[in-house]
From Swiss-Prot:
DNA-dependent RNA polymerase catalyzes the transcription of DNA into RNA using the four ribonucleoside triphosphates as substrates. It comes from the Bacteria. It catalyses: RNA(n) + a ribonucleoside 5'-triphosphate = RNA(n+1) + diphosphate. The gene is rpoB. GO terms for cellular component: DNA-directed RNA polymerase complex. GO terms for biological process: DNA-templated transcription. This is DNA-directed RNA polymerase subunit beta. Residues 1-23 are annotated as: Disordered. GO terms for molecular function: DNA binding; DNA-directed RNA polymerase activity; ribonucleoside binding.
Length: 1173
């Protein structure tokens, strides 16, 4: 084994003692055998690098300077915004007498900080200014101005955007790359293959070629009718002689030429024009300009750099990417395209072309469109860039119109420019685009994964319904680029993926992954990034290929991935290997890399495990896992939810909300600490300071833990003592039995914060008012409100309690003389208002922890028509309860069925009761054995060990301490603890006070029944497993309705918890009652409990008065059915048993009189908003 290094998880040194290091984090003891030359890169670089390029900030400039210094020419040297403004300049009027050009976009300082934006519901943005230059071409006069182009949203340090006060993430999109593609499809009518080729531009018309079953080479311009390719060549100025000279050896081209009737270039142009514009009189000039505009005009057609790069590589053309003309097609491109297609049709395997200025042999083959060489990433920067481009092109139209209408002398850049379309385009993108999403802030991992997501959906991408099996499938080129495991279950499976942990995006938008360079069978630590295309041409060994001490392959032959990707791995001589994986976890995403013993889990369950870690709720106290993978530290730090030192220095001041450091360079840095803030998902976002005054920190040292982190490590759940056994059938079908200790000690309790808001507006009848003076409400109901009518902080509230008192003016009715007299005597006070207070919704309760009041009188920015806005934050501590969903990291999920008293739980020989009982039948069928190995290793880590002598299994772990107490261990993905190592450690665990070892080398022990004290008959697997509490809490799902809102038309109760709806008694349920003959129950359900308006009021009346329940009437939906049939001109009448017609009355006045008497309203129509509910 190569050096068999035991690497500490977060650094590459060999410090193995489990001591606190300078930055406060404990070191994990790692079981890794493989030395990794490369640390995991910054996990948010995908977002931040792209945005840096767009705005061209200092970080980006530094990166460009470094790349230029190293001689890397592929890096873009102009920023995204500069590119767009350069592209649109100059805007000329229709005669070309005036022009307007833009340059040097730059940003002023943002108006508010990010925290203020969240507070005020504002967008975190900076004003964008551009230098605009207007030139009168006739006089040569130039006017220059700096023009404001609107507020431009800025990315926060964490890779998010704050839009209208909420954090959003822009997801990167996976799209088909511009370039040249060749396909082969079988013809339905004959046994021949049809060959097609197309050039897909970044924007502009498609160019398609096709060889049909008659071996005719056709061309389709701009998706219109097909015509002969020789016609196009002639229109481009080729003669028949030239065509024969270039393509004479191909039968298909000769056959096409024979059928072609056009003689001259003019004929060919007219012929093309007739096909593209049928019905218009053809002229040579019109045809020439049409053809030019389609493919040869940079304003209308753009291959983009990546399209030119792909065409150059595919067709062996040597045109510089920096060339001004590189973005449009050229005749040589079209000729090379035709040549490639006819060679493919003729069955040739190679063609000669050029690459990097040298002759190069091209492989002639069809393209696989799902290959990652043909799919690229549009990251944030490019998505916003496209949006700004759309806005600017709309603005361009306005500028042109204004140039013609305004007086030339008076024109300045400012008078021409209307920034509205630009601002609107940006706003529309952040507000409504499919790719701008409400950030998943459930825990640090869910946020991190959200930012690293790759989606094939969205504008210009695929749609769920049209995406076939092939696009969704795992492809060999995904290796090291997109995780094969982490993807949603359901309709989006395979369309949404996650970037692999080491992947990065190159300037063309292709995903690259790093490999170690190998020469002459010696592996170096030099790392090279390869795209999927490059990778297909080299031989790559796995990360676990055995090496000797000199980093040479220790075996003659090495297993590598075959050239061209796909297929089975092959054995080749060691000297032929060119590259080697940098790390075994290279192929998986961050969430998947957090699953220990992933190599022992079935992929379907691993998928669920990776997805469910993102649903874990941050608990009141976080605890790092005993068994981790060494990825916990990197994930927590890069997610940005822990506060880390930006510079080395000494802490001078510590409080709950602020930590101040004096840095070594003499500057001072303030670190803000969040206390009990609300995340997007309603979880508690809280920081805990870990440092003391006078403590020294290096760069990256942990200052404060965030939600679900422990000492700077990701900590999504709790280590619980589990037993795999059945218990009275209560853990049937994945149900879980939990100990009362977990509830009593708040082990799995979490804090949830709800935000309630209400505004006081101007209505037609007068202004609404926030007040304590609410009509018809007793004093004790108002006890919690202060003099403003707003609840005070610290109040305990239940469902239905008033949070903010508000009254709205009622419509003034015609007053009776008596009321007029009262009005005259008592003045305005008896004016009618109704109570529209903000109340705690059904099924919610908690403690008020915050109140924010925005008032127009205090110069707060409020929407038009709103005078006051009040926000109340209510926090509730949710203890774990039956019905909550728990899960492990291996896709093993279940619902708590029973919480047992501690004394009834099964216990170990030393009296320790287990915390949780899982059903052993959940393991074999699901094939996620990783959970069992985790359980055993968890026990070992908890008890610590003492290794006697030098057993065989220790030889691979020279750096494992021979003796340790309770510790945390890391078992990296695909390079973790082996079975014999776990067995050996189980045999070496520390003994109890009595000198007993509770669990033997099989990982099993004797358990005793807590109820009887008798031992269970067989040994049972017991150990520590990391258990997560998921965000599927029973309190949010349980729901019951007494009376509530009814639908407008059918008068039936609404459905769903949000509408306070009822449970639908559907068709099949009706059949069940019919089968039992339960006629009266059924009649009640279909009438008075549903939509018999008259009946339900009468029943309520009867219940209140203690009388018998009256006969039901006719359901409203029956009346709707009759109306529907009458509207189809069918005369439907309802007859009684004796044949007389029954009048269908509309809702009777009696209903309303009864309702008035009872003081209830049972005819409520559906509410117009959730607030009314």
């Amino acid at each position: 084994m190569e050096g068999s290094l035991l690497v500490a998880s977060s650094t590459s040194n060999n410090e193995t003692a489990n001591t606190a290091s300078t930055d406060g984090a404990t070191r994990r003891l790692s079981f890794a055998k493989i030395h990794e030359p490369l640390d995991v890169p910054n996990l948010l670089a995908l977002q931040t690098d792209s945005f840096d390029w767009l705005v061209g900030n200092e970080r980006w400039q530094a990166r460009v300077a470094k790349a230029v210094e190293e001689g890397d020419l592929s890096v873009a040297t102009t920023s995204g915004l500069a590119d767009i403004f350069e592209e649109i300049s100059p805007i000329e009027d229709f005669q070309g007498t005036m022009s307007l050009s833009f340059s040097e976009p730059e940003f002023a300082d943002p108006k508010y900080t990010m925290a203020e934006c969240k507070d005020r519901d504002a967008t975190y943005s900076a004003p964008l200014y551009v230098k605009a230059e207007f030139m009168n071409n006739n006089t040569g006069e130039i006017k220059q101005q700096t023009v404001f182009m609107g507020d431009f949203p800025l990315m926060t340090e964490k890779g998010t955007f704050v839009v209208n006060g909420t954090e959003r993430v822009v997801v990167s999109q996976l799209v088909r790359s511009p370039g040249a593609y060749f396909e082969r499809t079988a013809d339905k009518t004959s046994d021949k293959d049809i060959f097609t080729a197309k050039i897909i531009p970044s924007r502009g018309a498609w160019f398609e070629l096709e060889i049909d079953k008659r071996d005719q080479v056709g061309v389709r311009l701009d998706r219109k009718r097909k015509q002969s390719v020789t016609v196009l060549l002639k229109a481009l100025g080729w003669t028949e002689g030239q065509i024969l000279e270039e393509f004479g050896q191909y039968d298909s081209m000769r056959a096409t030429l024979e059928k072609d009737a056009t003689e001259t270039r003019e004929d060919a142009l007219l012929d093309i024009y007739r096909k593209l514009r049928p019905g218009e009189p053809p002229t040579v000039e019109a045809a020439q300009s049409l053809l030019d505009n389609l493919y040869f005009n940079a304003k209308r057609y753009d291959l983009a750099k990546v399209g030119r790069y792909k065409i150059n590589r595919k067709l062996g053309i040597d045109r510089s990417l920096g060339d001004k003309e590189a973005s449009v097609l050229h005749v040589e491109d079209i000729v090379a395209m035709i040549k490639f297609l006819v060679a493919l049709h003729a069955g040739e395997k190679t063609l000669m072309g050029k690459r990097d200025g040298e002759d190069h042999e091209l492989r002639v083959d069809v393209d696989d469109i799902d290959h990652f060489g043909n799919r690229r990433i549009r990251a944030v920067g490019e998505l916003i860039e496209n949006q700004v481009r759309t806005g600017l092109s709309r603005m361009e139209r306005v500028v042109r119109e204004r140039m013609t209408t305004q007086d030339v002398e008076a024109i300045t850049p400012q008078t021409l420019i209307n920034i509205r379309p630009v601002v609107a385009a940006i706003k529309e993108f952040f507000g409504t685009s499919q790719l701008s999403q409400f950030m998943d802030q459930n825990n640090p991992l869910s946020g991190l994964t959200h930012k690293r997501r790759l989606s094939a959906l969205g504008p210009g991408g695929l749609s769920r319904d049209r995406a076939g099996m092939e696009v969704r499938d795992v492809h060999p080129s995904h290796y090291g680029r997109m995780c094969p495991i982490e993807t949603p279950e359901g309709p989006n499976i395979g369309l949404i993926g996650s970037l692999a942990s080491y992947g990065r995006i190159n300037p063309f938008g292709f995903i690259e992954t790093p490999y170690r360079l190998v020469s002459e069978g010696v592996v170096s630590d030099e790392v090279q990034y390869l795209t999927a295309d490059d990778e297909a041409e080299v031989l790559i060994a796995q990360a676990n290929a055995p090496l000797d001490a000199d980093k040479k392959f220790s075996e003659e032959t090495v297993l590598v991935r075959a050239r061209g990707g796909g297929g089975e791995p092959v054995l080749v001589p060691a000297a032929d290997v060119q590259f080697m994986d940098v790390s075994p976890r290279q192929m998986v995403s961050v969430a998947t890399a957090l699953i220990p013993f992933l190599e022992h889990d079935d992929a379907n369950r691993a998928l669920m495990g990776a997805n469910m870690q993102r649903q874990a709720v941050p608990l009141v106290r976080s605890e790092a896992p005993f068994v981790g993978t060494g990825m916990e530290r990197a994930a927590a730090v890069d997610a940005g939810d822990v506060v880390i030192a930006k510079k080395a220095g000494v802490v001078t001041e510590v409080s709950a909300e602020l930590v101040v450091m004096i840095n070594d360079d003499g500057t001072e840095t303030n670190y803000r600490i969040n206390k009990f803030a609300r995340s997007n998902q309603g979880n508690c976002y809280n920081h805990r300071v870990l440092v003391n005054e006078g403590q020294r920190l290096e760069v990256g040292g942990i200052i404060a833990d965030g939600p679900a982190t422990d000492q700077g490590e990701l900590a999504l759940g709790k280590n619980l003592l589990v037993a795999f056994m059945s218990w009275e059938g209560h853990n049937f079908e994945d149900a879980i039995i939990l100990s009362q200790r977990i509830v009593a000690e708040d082990v799995l309790s979490s804090i949830h914060i709800e935000e309630h808001e209400i505004d006081a507006r101007d209505t037609k009848l007068g202004a609404e008012e926030i007040t304590r003076d609410i009509p018809n409400v007793s004093e004790e109901v108002l006890a919690g409100l202060d003099e403003r009518g707003i609840i005070h902080i610290g109040a305990e509230v239940e469902a239905g309690d008033i949070l903010v008192g508000k009254v709205t003016p009622k419509g003034e009715t015609e007053l009776t003389p008596e009321e007029r007299l009262l009005r005259a005597i008592f003045g305005e006070k008896s004016r009618e208002v109704r109570d529209t207070s903000l109340k705690v919704p059904h099924g919610e309760s908690g403690t008020v922890i915050g109140v924010r009041v925005f008032d127009r009188d205090n110069d707060d920015e409020l929407p038009p028509g709103v005078n006051q806005l009040v926000r109340v934050y209510v926090a509730a501590k949710r203890k774990i309860t039956d019905g909550d969903k728990l899960a492990g990291r291996h896709g093993n999920k279940g619902v708590i069925s029973k919480i047992l008293p501690i004394e009834d739980m099964p216990f170990l020989a030393d009296g320790t009761p287990v915390d949780i009982v899982l059903n052993p039948l959940g393991v074999p069928g699901r094939m996620n054995v990783g959970q069992v190995l985790e359980t055993h290793l968890g026990w070992v880590a908890k008890t610590g060990w003492k290794i006697e002598g030098e057993p065989e299994w220790v030889k691979n772990l020279p750096n494992l301490p021979r003796e340790t107490g309770q510790t945390t261990v890391a078992t990296p993905v695909f390079d973790g603890a082996r079975e014999e190592e776990i067995t050996g450690l189980l045999d070496s665990t520390n003994v109890t006070r009595d000198g007993d070892r509770l669990i033997d080398s099989s990982g099993k022990t004797r358990l005793f029944d807590g109820r009887s004290g008798e031992p269970f008959p067989d040994p049972i697997s017991v150990g520590y497993m990391y258990i997560l509490k998921l965000h599927h809490l029973v309190d949010d799902k349980i729901h019951a309705r007494s009376t509530g809102p009814y639908s407008m038309i059918t008068q039936q109760p609404l459905g769903g918890k949000a509408q306070f709806g009822g449970q639908r008694f559907g068709e099949m349920e009706v059949w069940a009652l019919e089968a039992y003959g339960a006629a009266y129950t059924l009649q009640e359900l279909l009438t008075i409990k549903s939509d018999d308006i008259h009946g339900r009021v009468k029943v309520y009346e009867a219940i209140v008065k203690g009388e018998n329940i009256p006969e039901p009437g006719v359901p409203e939906s029956f009346k709707v059915l009759i109306k529907e049939m009458q509207s189809l001109c069918l005369n439907v009448e309802v007859l009684s048993t004796d044949g007389t017609t029954i009048e269908m009355r509309d809702s009777d006045d009696a209903v309303f009189t009864a309702a008035e008497e009872l003081g209830i309203d049972l005819s409520r129509a559906e509410p117009s908003s959730v607030e009314e509910v």
